[in-house]
């Protein structure tokens, strides 16, 4: 049996911010409806219902002195150490994010230069053929970046790729929007390497979909529910609709991927 090239995760790394924010920390927030009117329920009730639905009772926020590319770098450094490879041997660095570097106290998005280029710089990589680029792809961005890495490796174009997913949603969340409790910050990274094998190993199949007919604006940028915040833009979502969408589509996508792999679901 002839050998084929497969993509295998050979190293992992992550960064978990140290700033811990518990649900009770939102008790003093002034939560508003989208029309700017106060929500006519006590914060205790709002928070209790949120925890009941999501199971979330705490989250991490990035430290004031860092930005997104910093924590992406921290995770990437750990992944390279875990893989034990020469960083100059990387063919690609792919960073999945949506808002770039947003400084503490600001909502201004900074995506030039690309976060992947900033990470490459912070890693001290001098190889000009280590191609660095970003993937802005919403919540599943890291998975889509991993899929792209898999294509590069299977084609023979690359041998080692650093894939990072990093986000600092706390910097673009509206404190007057109850949905802000679901957002948090952090970074994760993997090194994906080419492995020749007679048997399938590593990444076997994938499924991706983009639904826009009714869902395109379930996540969007919008002004604060507090008119006094002015024209600054914050991440807004239709939480209930997104929840219903996930329940409907994610299991189907998982089942399709399993079927494509040929692996029985019982395994």
Annotated model-derived regions:
Residues 43-69, 102-160:
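Conserved catalytic cysteine-centered active-site region
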Residues 72-79, 145-152, 254:
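Buried hydrophobic packing segments
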Residues 75-91, 253-267:
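Phosphate/pyrophosphate-binding loops at sites that engage ATP/ADP/AMP, CoA/4′-phosphopantetheine
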């Amino acid at each position: 049996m002839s050998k084929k090239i497969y993509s295998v995760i050979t190293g992992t790394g992550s960064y978990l911010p140290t700033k811990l924010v518990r649900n009770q920390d939102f008790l003093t927030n002034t939560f508003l409806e989208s029309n700017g009117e106060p929500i006519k329920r006590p914060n205790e009730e709002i928070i209790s219902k949120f925890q009941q639905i999501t199971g979330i009772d705490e989250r991490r926020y990035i430290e004031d002195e860092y930005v997104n590319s910093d924590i992406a770098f921290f995770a990437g450094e750990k992944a390279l150490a875990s893989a034990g490879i020469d960083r100059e041997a990387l063919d690609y660095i792919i960073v999945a994010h949506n808002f770039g570097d947003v400084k503490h106290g600001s909502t201004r998005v900074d995506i030039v230069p690309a976060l992947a280029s900033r990470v490459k710089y912070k890693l001290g990589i001098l190889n000009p053929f280590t191609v660095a680029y970003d993937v802005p792809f919403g919540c599943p961005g890291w998975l889509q970046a991993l899929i792209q890495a898999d294509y590069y490796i299977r084609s023979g174009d690359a041998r080692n790729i650093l894939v990072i997913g990093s986000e600092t949603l706390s910097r673009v969340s509206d404190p007057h929007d109850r949905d802000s409790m679901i957002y948090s910050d952090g970074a994760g990274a993997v090194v994906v390497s080419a492995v020749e094998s007679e048997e399938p190993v590593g990444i076997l199949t994938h499924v991706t979909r983009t639904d826009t007919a009714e869902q395109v604006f379930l996540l969007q940028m919008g002004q604060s529910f507090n008119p006094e915040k002015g024209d600054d833009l914050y991440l807004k979502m239709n939480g209930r609709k997104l929840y219903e969408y996930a329940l409907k589509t994610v299991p189907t996508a998982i089942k399709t991927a399993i079927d494509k792999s040929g692996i029985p679901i019982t395994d």
